[in-house]
């Protein structure tokens, strides 16, 4: 007896006859509703810029975290469900610290991304396994290791790709096409900041201010920009 479409919809571990996992596809669709995040890699390092949606004037802008530090040399920007992102980031932090403790060296950016995606593919661990749904979040992971700067993009299927520049979230289609036009491998870090924020400005529905944009760089150490530093980047546009 064949299951109906709705039964394939509910089962996260069941392939449909066409070979599709609908829950994973829906999670990928959910990210298209999230705030826009942009990553740009240069020879000096990687820049991340993210739109922060401040839904109320009563909200404290600094409490909306869209860029997080994983280790001294790795940071990540997110789009989608922040709680899911936090679960993945906490897992990555533990992995990087365990690696540092065991081997006396920092974990490579690719290995950290792989550890994150392994968890994404298992849909949680320990007691969370009973929840068993895909993580509704996509990440841009920026880092700097012995191989130089790198930028990775992950999605809810547990797949990851290495990119030179990438946009995720609701404005990703327009932002990606702008990145293709403006990106070149000889960009300086300062030019990458300007490009990332100017593209965010195009896709955002409101004026760009230090309250609704976060910027970070990994060059080679992770650094989240202060509101004054963000203001200086915006002033260059």
Swiss-Prot record:
Single biological process term from Gene Ontology: proteasome-mediated ubiquitin-dependent protein catabolic process
Descriptive protein name: Proteasome subunit alpha type-5-A
Chief location category: cytoplasm
An MF annotation (GO) of this entry: structural constituent of ribosome
Subcellular location(s) per record: Cytoplasm; Nucleus
Chain residue numbers at which the record places covalent cross-link Glycyl lysine isopeptide (Lys-Gly) (interchain with G-Cter in ubiquitin): 43, 66
Family label: Belongs to the peptidase T1A family.
GN (gene name): PAE1
Keywords: Acetylation, Cytoplasm, Isopeptide bond, Nucleus, Proteasome, Ubl conjugation
Complex and partners: Component of the 20S core complex of the 26S proteasome. The 26S proteasome is composed of a core protease (CP), known as the 20S proteasome, capped at one or both ends by the 19S regulatory particle (RP/PA700). The 20S proteasome core is composed of 28 subunits that are arranged in four stacked rings, resulting in a barrel-shaped structure. The two end rings are each formed by seven alpha subunits, and the two central rings are each formed by seven beta subunits. The catalytic chamber with the active sites is on the inside of the barrel.
Gene Ontology terms: cellular component: cytoplasm; cytosol; cytosolic ribosome; nucleus; plant-type vacuole; proteasome complex; proteasome core complex, alpha-subunit complex
N-acetylmethionine found at: 1
Native species: Arabidopsis thaliana (Mouse-ear cress)
The keyword Ligase belongs to this UniProt entry's keyword annotation: no
Origin organism lineage: Eukaryota, Viridiplantae, Streptophyta, Embryophyta, Tracheophyta
The protein's role, per its UniProt record: The proteasome is a multicatalytic proteinase complex which is characterized by its ability to cleave peptides with Arg, Phe, Tyr, Leu, and Glu adjacent to the leaving group at neutral or slightly basic pH. The proteasome has an ATP-dependent proteolytic activity.
């Amino acid at each position: 007896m064949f299951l109906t479409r709705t039964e394939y919809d509910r089962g996260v571990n069941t392939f449909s006859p066409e070979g599709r996992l609908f829950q994973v596809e829906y999670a990928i669709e959910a990210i298209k509703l999230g705030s826009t995040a942009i990553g740009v890699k240069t020879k000096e390092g990687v820049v991340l810029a993210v739109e922060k949606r401040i839904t109320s004037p009563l909200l404290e802008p600094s409490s909306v975290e869209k860029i997080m530090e994983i280790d001294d040399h790795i940071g990540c920007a997110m789009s989608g469900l922040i709680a899911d992102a936090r679960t993945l980031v906490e897992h990555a932090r533990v992995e990087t610290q365990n690696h540092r403790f065991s081997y006396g060296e920092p974990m490579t950016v690719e290995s950290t991304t792989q550890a994150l995606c392994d968890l994404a593919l298992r849909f949680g661990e320990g007691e969370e396994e009973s929840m068993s749904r895909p993580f509704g979040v996509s990440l841009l992971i920026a880092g700097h290791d012995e191989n130089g700067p790198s930028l990775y993009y992950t999605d809810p299927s547990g797949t990851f790709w290495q990119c030179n520049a990438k946009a995720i979230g609701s404005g990703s289609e327009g932002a990606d096409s702008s990145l293709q036009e403006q990106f070149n491998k000889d960009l300086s870090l300062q030019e990458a900041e300007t490009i990332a924020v100017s593209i965010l400005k195009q896709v955002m529905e409101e004026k760009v201010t230090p309250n609704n944009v976060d910027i970070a760089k990994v060059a080679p150490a992770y650094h989240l920009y202060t509101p004054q530093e963000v203001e200086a980047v915006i002033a260059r546009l």
